[in-house]
Each structure stands twice: as structure tokens, then as C-alpha cells.
Amino acid sequence: MAPAGLSLGATILCLLAWAGLAAGDRVYIHPFHLLVHSKSNCDQLEKPSVETPADPTLTPVPIQTKSSPVDEEALWEQLVRATEKLEAEDRLRASEVGLLLNFMGFHVYKTLSETWSVASGLVFSPVALFSTLTSFYTGALDPTASRLQAFLGVPGEGQGCTSRLDGRKVLSSLQTIQGLLVAPGGASSQARLLLSTVVGLFTAPGLHLKQPFVQGLSSFAPITLPRSLDLSTDPNLAAEKINRFMHSATGWNMGRPLAAASPDSTLLFNAYVHFQGKMKGFSLLPGLTEFWVDNTTSVPVPMLSGSGTFHYWSDNQNHLSMTRVPLSANGYLLLIQPHHTLDLRKVEALIFQHNFLTRMKNLSPRAIHLTVPQLTLKASYDLQDLLAQAKLPTLLGAEANLGKISDANLRVGKVLNSVLFELKADGEQAPESVPQPAGPEALEVTLNSPFLLAVLERSSGALHFLGRVSRPLSAE
């Protein structure tokens, strides 16, 4: 167990050891000057003032208080507006954040994939993970803030103000990254994507939260719901109340419900992400088709079918193929299929690494008739468990200094990320006979056995989702 006062340097060493990096492999290092505090901002922050007012606070209302239903169309419009007047520096900043969250995302995905069985499937959001950690960074004071910054991948070096992350810039860039994924490209663009994030802050009764922290979350989670309830008397009952409340507020069936937290917890941070992609030009095939979970077991699932010119690559050396399908003006769905079902684990370990985007350069356009399952993937994971596996169990533990979240001595319980990932056709049900495209003979690509997927935003290079599809309608 790492001591609470772990130095910044030791934290970085822990992170690098967990990531399995040798010094010569640090090709990902990048000048993150766009993400740290500017000199003028530092001068203002460091100017002594005896009249600095205390941060205003809010007291979360009881969990019985009703919340307006989540309006996902309004959230979509808000994300799109955030990208309408981007300057070059905003896009560069988003690219820097994309680099950081991809780096962290691949390592966390590896940890999750080793923990979850192949049969259970997996869907993971690097953006939600990075946003959650950045949120805690904005609420932290040293030494916790320095340790979180190192974990986010930006060593503070001299630890001066101008080497410290500006959490507001990072959260704003995360909003940009989300907006770029769903932004339309005009009348001829792809079908609309929905990407909605809701954060629930659940506190012990009477605990006060600082308003700047709560308001700052709106960049990546436009809807933040602070609620209070008894977390200690019956943790199982508290978990049931939270699950009912979030389902009532969002209408989303997130699958695996929140389990009971430790009875001494005073704050639970739960981020819920709903993604719905519609594949333009694809239709739902009549009836159900067998999806082979393994060589002897199949399940009937609805399938989507479409034809067009997609980017494709068959890697015979590593026994895999990759198909790239546009989802929006800036977003792509990447489908990675092992040539043999038993090779799924090997392909997963090979593909989901830091050279993932480099491999995409091998793709070339080709006429394809693509058949892919309709997807409803669900997953939940506790960031506290991931930190323990990273040998940083105290990072958000009892001794964490989270003085920008509350003046109370917080005890952070579960830090949950839950994902609901849906992939559908944008058209009606296809006729029994699907016409083939004119021109070159189309390659038949059918994903009717376990495969991998990724959702990429090309402008920032950020990976929004990574997944392993074992059961298209029940991966959780």
C-alpha cells in the first residue's frame, strides 16, 4: 500500500511501473503547455490577498427530491454549440487531452480485460475515466493534487504554478472532444449520434459541497445531480435508492446496479454515460441471426446490414481484419475481427496498444457489404478498484486532501463509471433481398462471432470507447 504522503516522483514511478514502460519507450511525451496555468494566471493565483472570500457552498437536497428527466436532445445541442467557434488553440488543446486519455485508456482497458472473462464482454470509456480523474483533480489540494496530476500523465516537474494542470482547461477540452464526435457535418452528414453524461454526487446528510467544484463539472457532465442520503446505516438500501433515483432521472437501464459502498463513506461519485450510434445506410435484417459466442454456442440476435465504400484491412500475419465505418462528420466506428474466434484475446492484446492509430494507416477504401449485430452493451466499474490494482489505493482514500470539494473530512467511497453503448440502424427493416452496390464486387464482411470495437474522434484523435463484444445484447 502506498503511503498517503507519497512524493510526486514516487507516484510517477508507480504509474510507469503499472504501465510497464521502459525509459526508452516514452515516445508519448508531449509539451502540455496548453493545459497548464499561464504565467498571468499564476500571478493572479499567487497574489496575496487577505480579503479572498471563502468558496460558496451548497447542501445537496435529499435523494427523494425529484429531478427533471434527462433531455438528451438538449444535451446534444449543447455539445454541438461548444464546437461552433473553436479556435486553433482549442483544437490543439483537445489533441493534447486526447493523447493523454488514450494513453491512460489503453492501460486501464488492459487491466479490465484481464479481470473480466471473455464471455462477459466489455465496454469502456476512456473519456469518462479521464473526466472523472480530472474532476477529482479540480477538487484536490496538495499532495493529492500533485499525485493526481502525475496519474493523469503530466508530471509537474518543478512543481511551480506554471507546471500545474489547469483543470478548467482540461475539462473544457473534454467537452470539445465530446462535441466534435457528435457534431453534424451538414445536410449530407451521417445519422445523429447521442452522447450524454450525467454525474450523481451522493453525500452523507449535512455535508456541504463547494459550488465552484460542482459547477466546474458541467463542462464534461452538463447534468450534475447532488443528492444526500444515509450511507452508513444500511449501505445496501442506500445503493438501491441511488439506483432507483438514477434510473428515474435518466430512464437508462445501466445493467449491473451499484453495489453497497463502505458504511463510512461520505461521498460517492457516479458518472453515467449513454452513447447511441445510428449507422447511416444500414437497415435491420428481418428475423434473428445466430451469433456464435464460441465454437459450440450461439445466440439469436438482430443484425444490421449495409453496403458502401468503407476502409478495410486484412492482416494475415496477425490473423485479424479491421473495418472502419463513418458514424458522424468526425466519428468512426472501428470493427476488429479475429480470423479465428479463439484468437480474440491475442488480437485484443495486440491491437489495443499505443500504436493503434498508426495501424489505421493500413486501411484502404473498398466496396463492402457489411453485416454487424445490433448492439446494447453495458458495463460498470469502480475507479477505486482500478487504483488499487495500480498500487495507488490511497490516491482517493481516507487521507486524500479534497479541500476544494468540501471543507469536511471527506471519505470517498465508490467512484463509479457506468456505460450504456447502443448501435442501431438508421433505416427501416431491410427487405428479404438486399441489393448489392454497383461497381466492383463487394467484399462480404459478417461479424457473427466475438469481435472488438472502438469509437474514434478523428480531429482530436481521442478514443471514446473500447469494447469486446461477446454477447451483443448482454455484455455487462
Curated annotation (Swiss-Prot):
Keywords: Disulfide bond, Glycoprotein, Secreted, Signal, Vasoactive, Vasoconstrictor. This is Angiotensinogen. Belongs to the serpin family. One of its GO terms (biological process) is regulation of systemic arterial blood pressure by renin-angiotensin. Its main location: secreted. One of its GO terms (molecular function) is serine-type endopeptidase inhibitor activity. In response to low blood pressure, the enzyme renin/REN cleaves angiotensinogen to produce angiotensin-1. Angiotensin-1 is a substrate of ACE (angiotensin converting enzyme) that removes a dipeptide to yield the physiologically active peptide angiotensin-2. Angiotensin-1 and angiotensin-2 can be further processed to generate angiotensin-3, angiotensin-4. Angiotensin 1-9 is cleaved from angiotensin-1 by ACE2 and can be further processed by ACE to produce angiotensin 1-7, angiotensin 1-5 and angiotensin 1-4. Essential component of the renin-angiotensin system (RAS), a potent regulator of blood pressure, body fluid and electrolyte homeostasis. The keyword Signal applies. Residues 45-64 are annotated as: Disordered. SUPFAM superfamilies: Serpins. Residues 1-24 form the signal peptide. It comes from the Eukaryota. One of its GO terms (cellular component) is extracellular space. Disulfide bonds join 42-161. Glycans are attached at residue 295. It is found in: Secreted. SMART domains: SERPIN.
